[in-house]
Amino acid sequence: MAVAAPGQLNLDESPSWGSRSVDCFEKLEQIGEGTYGQVYMARETETQEIVALKKIRMDNEREGFPITAIREIKILKKLHHQNVIQLKEIVTSPGPERDEQGKPIHGNKYKGSIYMVFEYMDHDLTGLADRPGMRFTVPQIKCYMKQLLTGLHYCHINQVLHRDIKGSNLLIDNEGNLKLADFGLARSFSNDHNGNLTNRVITLWYRPPELLLGSTKYGPAVDMWSVGCIFAELLNGKPILPGKNEPEQLSKIFDVCGTPDESNWPGVTKMPWYNNFKPPRQLKRRVKEYFKHFDRLALDLLEKMLTLDPAQRISAQDALDAEYFWSDPLPCDPKSLPKYESSHEFQTKKKRQQMRQADEAAKRQKTQHPQPHGRLPPIQQTGQPHPQIRPGQPMNNPHAPMAAGPGHHYAKPRGPGGSSRYPQGGNQGGGYPNRGGQGGGGSYGNAPYPQQGRGPPPPYPGSGMAGTGGPRGGVGGGYGGGSNYPQQGGPYGPSGPGRGSNYPQQGGSRNQQQYGNWQ
């Protein structure tokens, strides 16, 4: 297999995809769904290998193959890294798919379907975090964050922006390996940032301030803001910026990170939408105050990730070199992490929905068929035992008491020196379910959110992405994005960022710390 040098994409890898039928696979269970279609866990009938099948929805496409799917396939064919999801092949269904009665699913009886075949991952980070009683240890958080940053650094040095980093797009297997997934909104970029890009990307809770202020010239720093939100969420136990709409999202960012001005973000006043959302009063930066219960080194790294000015935001490479990853407790070996039952956001949301529906049905049943009121027992004479009281049971508590229930080693040398900031040029112009608070803000007036910039606005008020059904971007399950916005348009070797392997040796201590609701 040809190998791409750093900074270049592998253009020589060209397998004969599309030659096999989806009939080579047996669908086992649906694990994701979004505007793109469905994702299934499936088994290859010949090898018995478990894979993920992502169906590309074609019924709404008037101009042929969806542009987001084309971009995702082209990018994933060229990215080969242990922390990036592997696209194995493309398969097709030669004719119309049929339902249980044998009728074609699509209106056009001649239309087939196209599937992307991915390696199967047992969990996504959202589904794993939503497991009842789940508590991530500090070594586990460091392990996941280090893998996330390593995969993202590989994308960035190959001039690829992910543009939709969130928990449901971070897939984890039972060997502890984390992989970046869902490249439906990803695109290549140039270091000069001369081209205009759409600012209608990245799920709302993880969207950086430069995009919310209308920037169309941006670079890798947008992904690093999303990583900072994920990092704080892991430490905090819930999302830190759960805005309902774009103005409220900016309000929450300013409450935590302070008001941007020319002193802390040169050029911000020239942003297209700055005057629309300029707060009535100056707010100071309060990251350390909001997250004072975090470890000092964790807080220092978070400060650099949640920097308002994208030109001053830390890069993935320099984040890997932060003292946080080199202090006790060290990141654990991925293989040492516990194994869990399969947990995807789609599945956990489906279970919660079923529980809610069952509760609502029980309430309706109780309302429609109320229990008849029983008559009061006759007055008893003094000394006569109550007919409903058993011997030895107190008169003031006639009911019997009820029993209460219990409650991979990276081995990378220290990366090359370099600035910990992104270049100044080009940046000046630019799901998890809501377990957090109920919005705030409201201090930016009643003006509608401006519609300048490339790309269509979200069709529903308060939605983070088109067709996603909420700020988290729906239930894509990691293999597929919850958006179908039209966008503008070598294997990673052992040498790379960071200071080498820092996993503790066997027998070493692994200090357990607690952050909020997480251990």
Curated annotation (Swiss-Prot):
Keywords: ATP-binding, Kinase, Nucleotide-binding, Phosphoprotein, Serine/threonine-protein kinase, Transferase. Residues 426-444, 464-483, 490-499 have a biased composition (Gly residues). The active site is at D164. SUPFAM superfamilies: Protein kinase-like (PK-like) (SSF56112). Signal peptide: none annotated. It holds the Pfam family Pkinase. Gene3D superfamilies: Phosphorylase Kinase, domain 1 (3.30.200.20), Transferase(Phosphotransferase) domain 1 (1.10.510.10). Residues 25-325 form the Protein kinase domain. One of its GO terms (biological process) is positive regulation of transcription elongation by RNA polymerase II. It catalyses: L-seryl-[protein] + ATP = O-phospho-L-seryl-[protein] + ADP + H(+); L-threonyl-[protein] + ATP = O-phospho-L-threonyl-[protein] + ADP + H(+); [DNA-directed RNA polymerase] + ATP = phospho-[DNA-directed RNA polymerase] + ADP + H(+). Residues 336-519 are annotated as: Disordered. Belongs to the protein kinase superfamily. CMGC Ser/Thr protein kinase family. CDC2/CDKX subfamily. This is Cyclin-dependent kinase C-1.
